[in-house]
């Protein structure tokens, strides 16, 4: 339906513009005989001005028409939404979203803090071995001594444990800063 109105309006403006242009020509140059095609125009600038004027008039009329169509469409949309107001209100209540900015930022900051605390607690409790308690793991390591390399294996295990303990203490003592 809109396209029919659009085409009809466009046709009316074209016909009106051509009538105005024809009337202007007859008013400015009243001739008793038709001009031949080979006859040169007296002033080419005058012809360009007429052409620009008619194009400007058409563009102006066309933009006014489009503005009025937009206004009509907007009024029609307002009337339709007023009629269906209850349906729209229910739909918006069902799918109402939370505020994007602050709520999401606060939740993500909270979740990051919780994840860091859980990771530190996991490191303190299990140090990577969830299956065995600390005492059982050390007793097993001492029971698996070999003649060659037992001292170096035992020493590296102790050093690893000390390094892990120092790292965990450092993590616990340093404050977690917020990302910005």
UniProtKB/Swiss-Prot annotation:
Site (Cleavage): residue numbering on this chain: 52-53, 83-84, 91-92, 97-98, 130-131, 145-146
Cellular location(s): Secreted
Record PTM Phosphoserine, positions in chain: 54, 105, 108, 150, 152
Any one GO molecular function term: identical protein binding
Coiled-coil residue spans: none
A Pfam match: Hormone_2
Sites of Arginine amide modification: 127
Post-translational modification, as annotated: Proglucagon is post-translationally processed in a tissue-specific manner in pancreatic A cells and intestinal L cells. In pancreatic A cells, the major bioactive hormone is glucagon cleaved by PCSK2/PC2. In the intestinal L cells PCSK1/PC1 liberates GLP-1, GLP-2, glicentin and oxyntomodulin. GLP-1 is further N-terminally truncated by post-translational processing in the intestinal L cells resulting in GLP-1(7-37) GLP-1-(7-36)amide. The C-terminal amidation is neither important for the metabolism of GLP-1 nor for its effects on the endocrine pancreas.
Signal peptide: 1-20
Region described as Disordered: 25-58
Record key words, sorted: Amidation, Cleavage on pair of basic residues, Hormone, Phosphoprotein, Secreted, Signal
Propeptide: 84-89, 131-145
GO CC terms in record: cytoplasm; extracellular space; plasma membrane; secretory granule lumen
GO process annotations (BP): adenylate cyclase-activating G protein-coupled receptor signaling pathway; cellular response to glucagon stimulus; gluconeogenesis; glucose homeostasis; negative regulation of apoptotic process; negative regulation of execution phase of apoptosis; positive regulation of calcium ion import; positive regulation of ERK1 and ERK2 cascade
Protein origin, superkingdom: Eukaryota
UniProt-listed PANTHER family: GLUCAGON, PRO-GLUCAGON
Record family assignment: Belongs to the glucagon family.
Protein name, entry field: Pro-glucagon
